[in-house]
């Protein structure tokens, strides 16, 4: 009964997703506009229970410009988190506020922010982008951008712009894919940004920012296998690397549910309303005793509350997919991107999950 109540709430959010006012940013090319707008967003949170106030302006009100026309510009795009009161000491930077959210960004918002970042890095004067997000969104934004963007320009996601700017400005930040900087100044590949539930210092950092704001790299530049140039995602699913898929194919509903004794018939009954499920494995090992699976919708199993764990396809029910080393949030993001692009077969999903 509890599960049915939760599912009813999840299905209700499918009718709550509406077009974002950020679309006006592209319609009117507001990045280069000389005026500004304040718009109340109707974007729902992932559970459809609340919305954010969106303010965007690229003229005089909410964009701070310390660049010169001749210099490359580092774009700081704010969706939450911490930014300095003034950035007058920083040259060649633009600050643009899209959201001021303290909630985890949903898939609609992630795609909307990606469209802004894409517009930014396509500009020849752009040296790269820093995206400031709240702590709840850091993992999702970092991983989402890692899949969406295939560029040599640095894109750095952070809770605090002061930590990320030295990284984005560092010449060795290129050719690494999207990076994230946590509040303890550790730098991660976006693919391996630690889950929010894990303690600081977890995961696989690639660098650290010292007290003098110098970046100390641990490894030579390279991209994780998941998103490398010869990966399945890059070679066979290049359509993943577009921030516009959501506009063409609609918003996917991919809930995260916890392991339990739910019948396959109940799961299959959701196939008309959800595009997939991520099941959080309750086992202390990589395997699961759960029987949740479906022939109608993709079901992906992931492990929670550990920096890194691996769930293989042989560890899950026959008609399900193992998320490999991806956390539930990362699995939800990848499954959502796949759904947006029509990639739903078990064999295809097995090829893109690690």
UniProtKB/Swiss-Prot annotation:
It comes from the Eukaryota. One of its GO terms (biological process) is cell wall assembly. Induction: In response to nutrient limitation. Repressed by high glucose concentrations. SUPFAM superfamilies: Glutaminase/Asparaginase. The keyword rRNA processing does not apply. InterPro entries: Asp/glu_Ase-like_sf, Asparaginase/glutaminase-like. One of its GO terms (cellular component) is extracellular region. Residues 50-354 form the Asparaginase/glutaminase domain. Residues 1-19 form the signal peptide. Residues 20-37 form a propeptide. It is found in: Secreted. Glycans are attached at residues 40, 50, 53, 58, 61, 65, 87, 94, 100, 106, 118, 172, 239, 286. To yeast sporulation-specific protein SPS100. May be involved in cellular adaptations prior to stationary phase. This is Protein YGP1. It comes from Saccharomyces cerevisiae (strain ATCC 204508 / S288c) (Baker's yeast).
């Amino acid at each position: 009964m509890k599960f049915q109540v939760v599912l009813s709430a999840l299905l209700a959010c499918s009718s709550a997703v509406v077009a974002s006012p950020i679309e006006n940013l592209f319609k009117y090319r507001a990045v280069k506009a000389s005026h500004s707008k304040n718009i109340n967003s109707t974007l729902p949170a992932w559970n459809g229970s609340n919305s954010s106030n969106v303010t965007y302006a690229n003229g005089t009100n909410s964009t701070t410009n310390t660049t010169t026309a001749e210099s490359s510009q580092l774009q700081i795009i704010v969706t939450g988190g911490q930014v300095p009161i003034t950035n007058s000491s920083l040259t060649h930077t633009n600050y643009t506020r899209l959201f001021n959210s303290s909630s985890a960004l949903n898939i609609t918002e992630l795609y909307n922010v990606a469209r802004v970042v894409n517009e930014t890095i396509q500009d020849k004067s752009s040296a790269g982008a820093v995206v400031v997000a709240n702590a709840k969104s850091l993992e999702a934004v970092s991983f989402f951008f890692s899949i969406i963007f295939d560029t040599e320009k640095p894109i750095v996601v952070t809770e605090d712009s002061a930590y990320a700017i030295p990284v984005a400005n560092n010449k060795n930040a290129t050719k690494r894919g999207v990076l994230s900087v946590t509040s303890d100044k550790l730098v991660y590949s976006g693919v391996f940004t630690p889950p929010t539930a894990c303690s600081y210092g977890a995961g696989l950092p690639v660098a650290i920012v010292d007290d003098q704001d110098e970046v100390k790299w641990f490894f030579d530049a390279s991209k994780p296998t998941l998103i490398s140039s010869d990966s399945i995602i890059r070679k066979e699913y290049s359509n993943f690397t577009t921030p516009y898929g959501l506009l063409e194919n609609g918003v996917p509903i991919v809930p995260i549910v916890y392991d339990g004794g739910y019948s396959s018939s109940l799961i299959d009954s959701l196939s008309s309303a959800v595009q997939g499920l991520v099941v959080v494995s309750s086992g202390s090992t990589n395997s699961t005793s759960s029987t949740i699976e479906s022939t109608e919708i993709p079901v992906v199993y992931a492990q929670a509350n550990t920096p890194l764990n691996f769930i293989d396809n042989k560890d899950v029910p026959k008609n399900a997919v193992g998320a490999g080393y991806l956390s539930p949030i990362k699995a939800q993001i990848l499954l959502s991107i796949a759904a947006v692009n029509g990639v739903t077969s078990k064999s295809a999903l097995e090829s893109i999950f690690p």
